[in-house]
């Protein structure tokens, strides 16, 4: 049986008691006059991991950036529709984008530690936000959550750039955790990592997914199947003028998407017959 709407998980007993953390309502994104993502309506469950999959150019990362208004920083970008967080559209004129980004953190594809010490990488965000608690305790907690503390506890004053690629990415995750977000966005967080580092990040994601709402963009379907609870499949469409834009095809529990998808194009993509 097909779900009633592509952005709503099916109504099975496993899905019945889900709490929605974030919701997009008919969200479209434009770069100048070019439509990049069309009319996406999607409900993201709280304290679960949701994966966005689909071919290049289907709007996964563009939509991800809508959740913390990072598209605001791209010249010519425009978002239509609503992104609902705690009952309010984050694009309303009275909403502070900086506060949105504090509550909805983003980890980029390539590790990007600041040219500062490991300690100051973690402490930077809380300091900027006026944190009044014990900073040493906060730094340790964030590094422990990112499963990095035991590796760096004796060299907190050394540069974050001295760490390996996998350690740098976990440092960036710890930096995000230190601002105490409710939602963590991850844009291909393992794309530049070796298989061992990737496995550690995936194990970390599974642990964090119990306490945070996580949305991950990935081209690695095996990764989506391993770590996510829900999966949204996006595909491209060509408009009348020959320009491509992204659209949501199907959203459901990950096992449904990979084992019994409702749409043929989803099945073709996850089975490797796409294109």
Curated annotation (Swiss-Prot):
Gene Ontology BP annotations: phosphate ion transmembrane transport
Every ABC transporter domain range: 22-261
Keywords, sorted A to Z: ATP-binding, Cell inner membrane, Cell membrane, Membrane, Nucleotide-binding, Phosphate transport, Translocase, Transport
Membrane topology: Peripheral membrane protein
Entry EC number(s): 7.3.2.1
Gene3D superfamilies registered for this protein in UniProt: P-loop containing nucleotide triphosphate hydrolases (3.40.50.300)
Binding positions (ATP): 54-61
GO cellular component: plasma membrane
UniProt-annotated location(s): Cell inner membrane
Reactions listed under catalytic activity: phosphate(out) + ATP + H2O = ADP + 2 phosphate(in) + H(+)
InterPro entries: AAA+_ATPase (IPR003593), ABC_transporter-like_ATP-bd (IPR003439), ABC_transporter-like_CS (IPR017871), P-loop_NTPase (IPR027417), PstB-like (IPR005670)
GO molecular function: ATP binding; ATP hydrolysis activity; ATPase-coupled phosphate ion transmembrane transporter activity
Transmembrane region(s): none
Family: Belongs to the ABC transporter superfamily. Phosphate importer (TC 3.A.1.7) family.
Function: Part of the ABC transporter complex PstSACB involved in phosphate import. Responsible for energy coupling to the transport system.
Summary of subunit composition and partner proteins: The complex is composed of two ATP-binding proteins (PstB), two transmembrane proteins (PstC and PstA) and a solute-binding protein (PstS).
NCBIfam families associated with the record: 3a0107s01c2
Protein name: Phosphate import ATP-binding protein PstB 1
Organism encoding this protein: Synechococcus sp. (strain JA-2-3B'a(2-13))
Gene assigned in the entry: pstB1
């Amino acid at each position: 049986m097909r779900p009633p709407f592509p952005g709503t998980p099916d109504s099975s007993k496993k899905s019945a008691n889900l709490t929605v953390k974030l919701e997009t309502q008919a969200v479209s994104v434009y770069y100048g006059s070019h439509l990049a993502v069309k009319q996406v309506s999607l409900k993201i469950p709280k304290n679960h991991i949701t994966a966005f999959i689909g071919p290049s150019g289907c709007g996964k990362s563009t939509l991800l950036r809508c959740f913390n208004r990072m598209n605001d920083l791209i010249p010519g970008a425009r978002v239509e529709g609503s992104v609902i967080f705690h009952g309010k559209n984050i694009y309303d004129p009275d909403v502070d984008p900086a506060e949105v980004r504090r509550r909805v953190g983003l980890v980029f594809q390539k590790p990007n530690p600041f040219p500062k010490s490991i300690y100051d990488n973690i402490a930077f965000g809380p300091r900027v936000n006026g944190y009044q608690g014990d900073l040493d305790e906060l730094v340790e907690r964030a590094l422990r959550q990112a499963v990095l503390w035991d590796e760096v506890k004796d060299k907190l004053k050394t540069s974050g750039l001295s760490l390996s690629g996998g350690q740098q990415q976990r440092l960036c995750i710890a930096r995000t955790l230190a601002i105490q977000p409710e939602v963590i966005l991850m844009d291909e967080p393992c794309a530049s990592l070796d298989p061992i580092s990737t496995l550690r990040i995936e194990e970390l994601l599974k642990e964090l997914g119990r306490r945070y709402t996580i949305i991950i963009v990935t081209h690695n379907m095996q990764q989506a199947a391993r770590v996510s609870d829900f999966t949204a499949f996006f595909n491209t469409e060509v408009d009348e003028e020959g320009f491509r834009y992204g659209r949501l095809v199907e959203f459901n529990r990950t096992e449904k998407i990979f084992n019994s998808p409702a749409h043929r194009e989803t099945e073709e993509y996850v089975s490797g017959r796409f294109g």
